[in-house]
């Protein structure tokens, strides 16, 4: 499993699943000694932090998910300010139904940032829902009166419609995560689960507030996790990024060797077949690189059509052999246009390799490797050249 997929699958449980699990442990064991006032403060602090992070990183989906949770929590709290009779019963049912619906819709939506059109349309949609809930709260529906106690919210989850709604939403959110494997999709699932537990615990009070705090933390942390993925992984090739490569070089133990691979005539593929074919070629070469390195080696996209790998403990000759084996496999591959099966020509790579010298700077090592790559290009391409020891 490549580095991107490992990190992506880890995000199914980290941080959302772990945060919710820790909350459950603290509540069930009685170790949560925070006062209700402090929990309320943490809830609003987490909400504010989530809003700021979502705005700063242009994550409108998470921003509006936090807004949905805030509106739902406020609605549940408001209904307990007076007699909880039939109309409030209907409004609570609507609130509990609308939260999973909105989470699914936000998960299915494309991330469009905070453009005026997307913000206004989403706010209007949420305003209409809020109006419906308010209208239900004022309507004279003939529902059985409910006692003024938080414990009477939990039975709403026993409704077959509520169970079906949460079940369908949970399945859809999990499917979205499996398809996309991104932190936001995982956060929607775990945050919705925490919301269900908040409602099940009564909707208001110390336990419910703890679950609402967890909801906000899960969504806020998903933005940080997404930022990490964008900084340290290349989404196109699923390889680690240049930053991850450089950070590894700063911490790796000697001896080690590196290889730089450059796709021959890459511009020709882009100019002849279009950028989509160029991206396909890049993904194919990245796949051969990832499959061809040894256990413990690191492959990364360094920039453009240039890929690099670090081979810890490898001599210059071992590095050359590994790189040349990858080069030969790429040259022997048959690359075709997706959908039509049209062959797009032979793809070849040129490779330069170098071994770290004691006392050598990172920049000097990369420069020697680039010089070896240049020699490979000058030698007719589709070959591997080792830098002078």
Which role does the model predict for each range below?
Residues 1-228:
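Regulatory sensory/coupling modules that transmit signals to nucleotide-handling catalytic cores
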Residues 229-247, 261-275, 283:
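Conserved nucleotide-binding and Mg2+-coordinating catalytic segments in signaling enzymes
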Residues 237, 259-262, 304, 369:
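Conserved metal-coordinating catalytic motifs of nucleotidyl cyclase and c-di-GMP turnover enzymes
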Residues 242-258, 269, 286-294, 312:
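Short regulatory alpha-helical coupling segments
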Residues 286, 318-339, 349, 368-370:
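Alpha-helical scaffold within the catalytic cores of cyclic-nucleotide enzymes
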Residues 298-301:
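A short pre-motif secondary-structure segment
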Residues 310-321, 338-342, 349-365:
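Catalytic strand-loop-helix junctions within cyclic-nucleotide turnover domains
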Residues 320, 354-388:
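Catalytic-core segments of nucleotide cyclases and related cyclic-nucleotide turnover enzymes
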